Structure formats: C-alpha cells, structure tokens
Amino acid sequence: MKIFYKAINMTLSMFTVIPLPKYEWDDRAAKHIMKLYPFIGLIIGALWYLSFFVLSKLNVPIMLMAALILTVPYILTGFLHLDGFMDVSDALLSRRDKETKLRILKDSTVGAFSVISVVLLLLVEFAGMFTVLNKNLDMRILIFIPIASRVINGYFIVSQEMLGQSSLAKFFKEGTGKVDEIILLGIYVLVALITFFTLGINYLIAILAMGLISFILLLKVKKELGGINGDVAGYILVLMEFTGILLLGII
C-alpha cells in the first residue's frame, strides 16, 4: 500500500502542477506510474468539467468561457505536453532527413514551425470549444477526454520502442510488460463503454476517433523518427484531445 501511495504521489508530481509533499524517487513505485496515468486524466478531467460548471454558473460569456476552459488542462499539466507538441512539430515539419529531425527534436531553441503549429492548434481548438459550448452538448465529456488520451499514451509508452536512451524508457518502461498493456487497453474499452452509456453515440465516436488518430500519428512518428519519447508522447496526447474537441464541434 505504501508503494502504491508513493506511485500516486510520483505520478501526480510528474504530470501535474498540483502541490504535493516532497518524496524520494522509488524505482519500485515507478513501474506503476503508467497504470496510474489514467488516474491523472480523471483528475484533470474532473477539474476541467468543474471549471465549466463554475463559469457557466457565473454566466461568463461563451467566447470568454471557451478561452478560459481551453487553458485549464494546459495549466494543470504545466504546459508539459504542449511543449512536446511544439518540439515534435518543429522536427516533423522541417522535412529534413531522420538524423536532422532528431537533432531538431533535441534542440531547445523554439523554431518557426513550432510557433506556427501551436498558434494554429490553439486557434482551431478554441473554435472547436466555442462551437461545443454553443451546441449545448453534455460537457461531462470533458471528464472522459483526458482519461482516454492518457490511457492510449500510457499504452504507447509501455509497448513501443523508445528513441535512444529516453528517460521514459528508464523510468516508465522498465518493469512493465504485457499485463500493463492489457490493463491500459482494458481501461480504454471501459472508458468507451461508460461514455456510450452515459453520454451517447456521438460522444463515443469522439473517444474512438481519438484512438484512431493516435495510431495514425504513432505510425507517422515511428516512420519519420524511429520511435517515441516524452516529446512524442506529448505531441500525440495534445492532438488526441484536439481531435476529441474538434469532432464534437462537427458532429
């Protein structure tokens, strides 16, 4: 139980900005982090929905509400995944050879492609959120989107080849195996079923589309970079959640 509690603490500390007591890194607890990654999604999703609930009760104008709600998951994660999205976008859009792309990925300099990509992402995502709010959809979907994105992300991290000596390989992949993959896939199926029975078919389509786009992105990244790392995981996660919001605005 102590190890499990420490694993929760470690997971929250690594993937959110939620203040927690200081802890010492424990390799035994680290192997449980990916199984707990969906729990991070649940917390972020609950706070995401809570932000909508509070803002709607305050009668905040829809356009402003859309902008504020959109920032919540990014703020809660310390812009961790958005940073990865920018880095990978810079590498992939460079249209260089594999070695150059990997060098760009490691470069801390903010490139033009990363800036263009994040501006377009946030602009379209804002339009999607604004449309979703205008359509008076069931905003409980905000709870499920971050869970689904992190389930799939966790599955990729434990099942796919890592780029070089990625820190993810050392801290998260070691000590995991087929059982972890099955658990994460099982959670994704459970999330899809709960979404369908509580919200309906259109919301299920959004969750399934997130899964589909994630595998398409994974194939693209593996082809161009050769594997995944923390930045790639963030890139895929951001675009999964973007897909979920955008699709809800369309269907």
Swiss-Prot record:
Descriptive protein name: Adenosylcobinamide-GDP ribazoletransferase
Entry keyword set: Cell membrane, Cobalamin biosynthesis, Magnesium, Membrane, Transferase, Transmembrane, Transmembrane helix
Subcellular localization: Cell membrane
Catalytic activity: alpha-ribazole + adenosylcob(III)inamide-GDP = adenosylcob(III)alamin + GMP + H(+); alpha-ribazole 5'-phosphate + adenosylcob(III)inamide-GDP = adenosylcob(III)alamin 5'-phosphate + GMP + H(+)
UniProt xrefs under Pfam families: CobS (PF02654)
GO CC term, one of those recorded: plasma membrane
Gene Ontology terms: biological process: cobalamin biosynthetic process
Necessary cofactors: Mg(2+)
GO molecular function, one term: adenosylcobinamide-GDP ribazoletransferase activity
Pathway: Cofactor biosynthesis; adenosylcobalamin biosynthesis; adenosylcobalamin from cob(II)yrinate a,c-diamide: step 7/7
Segments passing through the bilayer: 36-56, 60-80, 110-130, 141-161, 181-201, 202-222, 231-251
Family membership noted in the UniProt record: Belongs to the CobS family.
Membrane topology: Multi-pass membrane protein
UniProt xrefs under InterPro entries: CobS
Organism field: Clostridium perfringens (strain ATCC 13124 / DSM 756 / JCM 1290 / NCIMB 6125 / NCTC 8237 / Type A)
Keyword Transferase: yes
